[in-house]
């Protein structure tokens, strides 16, 4: 959790694609290396912590939606590809399924429900929030998944040794 918050803080000026990809990498790695409950704890607590220190979502109503999207990502990765030596095909399936599911979760909850029905936003805020929680979420979840596929196996070996 601390690593995730530190990465968000350090990379916040680098844009959504860098920060989001690294956040998703850490979320996936947490689930695969610490187990489902450890990964879910990081997934749910990270947007709360990020919001509380001013580096997360700008609106408190968005925090639970981000936590839900993170939890979906971790849950699907762990369910599909948690085996210590999961074949690359299972990892690829996890990458696609989890990235699409996180994207759809955030898009439907934030863009299609919170923005038009719950939040009171001006036109510019609506455009920014809608853009942030649409297609870029799919890309950053996929990049985070690729990075996890590359980094989790050597991390597991390093910890085992």
List each model region and its residues.
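Loop-helix junctions at membrane interfaces
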Residues: 1-161
